[in-house]
Amino acid sequence: LRKRPMCLACLLLLLGMLLFSSGASDKDADRKISGNDSVSVEGQVYKREEKANSLQIYLKNISIIQPGQTGSQNTSQPENAENYGAMLEKSNLLIRLDKNQNKIKIGTYVRAAGILKEPEKATNPGQFDFARYYAAKGIYYILDDARTLAVSGSYDLILETLCSLRETLAKKFDEIGGEDAGFLQAMLLGEKSNLEEEMKDLYQLGGISHILAISGLHISLLGMALYKWLRKHGTGFLCAGLISGLLMAAYCVMTGFGVSAKRALLMYLVYLGAQIFGRTYDLLSGLAFSAVVILTGSPELLGDVSFLLSFLAILGLGTLQPLIASIFHVNNKIILGILSGAAIQIITVPVSLWFFYETSLFGLVLNLIVLPLLPLVLAFGAAGAAVGFISIKAGIICFAPCHYLLKLYELLCRLAASLPGSRIVLGQPEIWQLFVYYGLIAGLFLGARIYGRFTDSSRVPGCLGGAAFLAALGTVLVLDTSSGLRITFLDVGQGDGICIQSDTGKVYFIDGGSSSEKSVGKYRIIPFLKYYGISYLDGLILTHGDEDHINGARELIEGKEGIGIGCLILPDVSTDDEIYRELESLAKERRIPVQYLNSGMSIQEKDGLSLVCLHPAAGYKASSRNGESSVIMLSYGSFRALFTGDLEEAEERMLLRQQAFSRVDVLKAAHHGSKNSTTDEFLQVTRPEAAVISCGEGNRYGHPHKELLLRLGEAGCRSYLTKDLGAVQVVTDGDRYTLSCGARPSGRM
């Protein structure tokens, strides 16, 4: 560190940020808004993006327009407009306008009216946190359904020119690229909105999704090629450095200036400075310098996935790869290339798991093929766009090699996806696992300093030791120290989704659907499962056929995200309901066995977990789907929980007459907290201590009804509403239980 003062400065900065981060974690506590209020605002445009269905502009220097000001006619402000103004002063603002809105130039001042919202916060474990994502960009509010009131002031010529160039190039890729346009727009322009979701997922599964972002790799390839070309053609060090530095800075700004691009640009500028002043470029010092600059300006990026992966990848190249090469006397360029990929993979896997919960076994192999070909993809893509300004046909011809290379990428990803082990779902590691993992890597460096390189006679034992070291790293990440039973009532909006996990690895999922959240399986259920390292459900139990209980489960059955299902369990009722036939057919296509659940049947696990069906009786015919709902009693030691689906009052009273119910600890209140279910008589028999009500914010049914909440309170039962608290999680050892809520419940086992 004495030879690298910038590395020491970076280390001290990181230490200081970690020490003071706890005190700053609640900085946004004063940014809460009471609801979705209509407001009028003014600010300066610093960024513009054209999306498929909207025009998005980003404002800074925000202020609330008071009634009576120019441009505020026909608009009203909320009573607490002054408070909003104070909050917005600390925030940038994203405004979503109609797609047909006239272009608003960067640098101008805009007055707009719309609905002020907070970005969606994660309410379930594993769910993507839009609030945190936008906070890393300095954005704490979004103005939705907006309309412009006035545009004034001069625009920023440089930024507007770069943004217009980006939009023009994007349209040119559409003209020459056809189905491949989205790839080049992502790779060269940083615009991912036109990339098909299926292809994004495919590249991620193959472990090569990093090439779809403007990353350090792109800046390095383009910047180094430009600088070397200028030097080769007689340009001096200073002139070549200034030209290439300015052009790469302009390119980074044009493509959105993401954190990875910032890191690469800063390191590139350090490299150019070394060239100009005749100094030796040090990779780690350049990395540390870029970290200090970025974190000083935006300390919230310390927890950003792009920041962490970008810096760790270069750290792996600058430390782990040369260490391994030195220990084993590796000089072969091909082997060094493999070591580079392996070093990046080893050092970034824990962070990838922290954010994405899964990894790819074949990412390293695919990258060995994909990365050497990437310069050709970028070159032919850029050439096609450039020639396309002269002739579309000629541009298409120039673009052709790029098309076939992208097809090769797709073929490789599909091949990898078809192989066993293509998707390893390990879940989010715990903090102690991260410390142990990186502690072992630090121990490797310490051991290398003490013992040095292997001699020829010690290479075989050294290789065996290396294999043992990798096995130790893997063991740390897969180690599971959980115990007991975990029940999670997911926040799926207006719907139901319940996960039951035992410490022996058995997992059952009850229902899974929503009438208020789109693609609830993809965005809430599947991320939750992956967060806990769940890639297989022993049973998927659907209580009845309403869409708010099955549409997310249908996504699971379709199997696009690699979640295996041991058995689909449907209610054993007398009905010709088409929805059950559809589910049976879909399960048959996926080779998933289907079983039918009726009263008296049970699932018994060796660890003591028991699921007993109380309703419906075999062949039961109800007046509605809700009346068909499977009612399940869970037992684990002395702990009891009751799941009631959308059971209606008539069936509830019928089961009371049959004396089917007994005392429970936790109740899943029927039908999202409807007025007539969960009667006084039912509560007197079951006497639950806690009732979980799964319902959506502002739902049109008025769930949960005040009458129900009153009944629960009078019965001495605490109510937990997912719309207010997020996911509700119960963890029990079979005797006592703890209950916690939110995206990071304290009851993690």
Regions found by a protein language model. Name each.
Residues 4-30, 473-478:
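Transmembrane alpha-helices and immediately adjacent membrane-cytoplasm interface residues
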Residues 8-10, 143, 197-364, 380, ...:
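Hydrophobic alpha-helical transmembrane segments in multi-pass membrane proteins
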Residues 16-210, 523-527, 536, 581-605, ...:
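Membrane-interface helix/helix-cap signal primarily in integral membrane proteins
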Residues 136-267, 272, 346, 488, ...:
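Aromatic-rich juxtamembrane segments at the membrane interface
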Residues 150-160, 205, 353-369, 381-438, ...:
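Membrane-interface amphipathic/re-entrant loop segments adjacent to transmembrane helices
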Residues 192, 295-303, 414-539, 588-666, ...:
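Core dinuclear metal-dependent hydrolase active-site scaffold
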Residues 537-548, 573, 667-671:
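Metallo-beta-lactamase
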Residues 567-569, 652-726:
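Cap/insert and terminal regions of metallo-dependent hydrolase folds
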